[in-house]
């Protein structure tokens, strides 16, 4: 079985945890897409009923509608479960997310979930956060160069995400600064410092949130728990 097929299998394992009548956080990205499609299939087949999705991006909202999942906006009520991908997964299941640009809506949604289930492939496993991927930080466009200068006082390097002539724009109308993490750092203290920087909306650090991860590896799907 190739890696893409195993990613689909990981998504199926995550969706097997969803029960009828639940409110489900719908993640964003190529792996979360498989989970949304499987939820739609189960609803259409009558294997699940009464599911309501809460989307973490315009892309996941569009896909949910296409596969027949009823959706509603995020409100103060808790979600029963959320399923999403990750860009890095540390041994304690702390995460870096946001390379797809939806980090703020993902965090706002998933912090309200009773259970956060991650699906990914084995290349996302790291010994420490920042080992393979930058840390996305969403910043407001107004004065963004000043915000970046403030961030570089304690996070040297990094760059504004700019795939073309103009900066990348999130669903919220903001920009993303991709920071390089140091070799050693206190994740919670760093998150506090970044979020305390004027102009920052939020970071791609998802700390203490994930309950488990289904990881597609060459020898099959591994289940990791906190």
From Swiss-Prot:
InterPro entries: NagB/RpiA_transferase-like, Ribose-5P_isomerase, Ribose5P_isomerase_typA_subgr, Ribose5P_isomerase_type_A. The active site is at residue 106. Its EC number is 5.3.1.6. The keyword Metal-binding does not apply. One of its GO terms (biological process) is pentose-phosphate shunt, non-oxidative branch. Pfam families: Rib_5-P_isom_A. It is an enzyme of class 5 (isomerase). Gene3D superfamilies: 3.30.70.260, 3.40.50.1360. Catalyzes the reversible conversion of ribose-5-phosphate to ribulose 5-phosphate. Belongs to the ribose 5-phosphate isomerase family. This is Ribose-5-phosphate isomerase A. It comes from Deinococcus radiodurans (strain ATCC 13939 / DSM 20539 / JCM 16871 / CCUG 27074 / LMG 4051 / NBRC 15346 / NCIMB 9279 / VKM B-1422 / R1).
